[in-house]
């Protein structure tokens, strides 16, 4: 029984986001996948309810090295972004990869699996987004709590859009968004156990 418990704990914590070597190798493995995700990124950008020329403020939750942030800052040339992540090593890599966008983004280091993480972020944001990140907390109640903390950060008329694995189940996650206060919650795309879903904050 103890062995099983240890195995489950290892599974929950299989990523070593604080290791420079691990983060570097993990990012290299993600590069081919980012090309595959361009379709979902484009759909996400189209779903943001603002004209692309407006100077909107974007929050990327669990931004990692900034793949989604880079894409959105190109799509919204007058936008700025805050990249939230819990790993300094990931933030370092992001700053390297987004050197050409210097001045249009900042990193804020905080752990979204810990209650109160959102207090370190200065909102509101017209668009809050996330890509293949929140599922890493593993615990359904923690995911639910993350959505509750995101809602107050969204500007009235804005949105939260999440491209992630359907784990916890998509139906549950969409219900948690409604519980948090989001309106118009829906799934915009899904396939291969991943989905793009989210909701809006009424004006």
Which residues does each PLM region occupy?
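Conserved beta-strand signature within the Rossmann-like core of class I S-adenosyl-L-methionine
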Residues: 157-164
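Class I SAM-dependent methyltransferase SAM/SAH-binding core
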Residues: 59, 65-115
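A short acidic, Gly/Pro-enriched loop at the edge of an enzyme's catalytic core
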Residues: 118-128
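Core SAM-dependent methyltransferase catalytic element
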Residues: 189-203
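A short SAM/SAH-binding and catalytic strip from SAM-dependent methyltransferases
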Residues: 126-141
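Conserved class I S-adenosyl-L-methionine
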Residues: 2-51
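Short alpha-helix
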Residues: 168-180
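A short glycine-rich, Lys/Arg-flanked "PGG" loop and its adjoining helix->strand segment in the class I
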Residues: 144-156
């Amino acid at each position: 029984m103890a062995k099983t418990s240890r195995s489950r704990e290892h599974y929950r914590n299989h990523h070593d986001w604080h290791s420079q070597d691990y983060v570097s190798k993990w990012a290299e493995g993600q590069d081919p996948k980012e090309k595959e995700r361009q379709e979902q990124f484009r759909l996400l950008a189209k779903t943001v309810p603002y004209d692309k020329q407006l100077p909107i403020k974007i929050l990327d939750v669990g931004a990692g090295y900034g793949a989604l942030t880079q894409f959105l800052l190109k799509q919204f040339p007058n936008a700025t972004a805050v990249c939230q992540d819990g790993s300094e090593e990931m933030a370092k890599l992001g700053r390297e990869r987004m050197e050409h966008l210097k001045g249009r983004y900042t990193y804020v280091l905080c752990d979204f699996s810990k209650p109160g993480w959102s207090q370190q972020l200065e909102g509101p944001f017209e668009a809050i987004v996330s890509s293949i990140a929140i599922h890493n907390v593993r615990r359904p109640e923690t995911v639910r709590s993350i959505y509750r903390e995101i809602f107050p950060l969204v500007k009235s008329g804005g949105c939260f859009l999440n491209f992630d694995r359907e784990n916890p189940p998509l139906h549950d996650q969409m219900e948690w968004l409604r519980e948090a206060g989001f309106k118009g919650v829906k799934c915009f795309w899904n396939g291969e156990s991943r989905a793009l879903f989210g909701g809006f904050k009424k004006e």
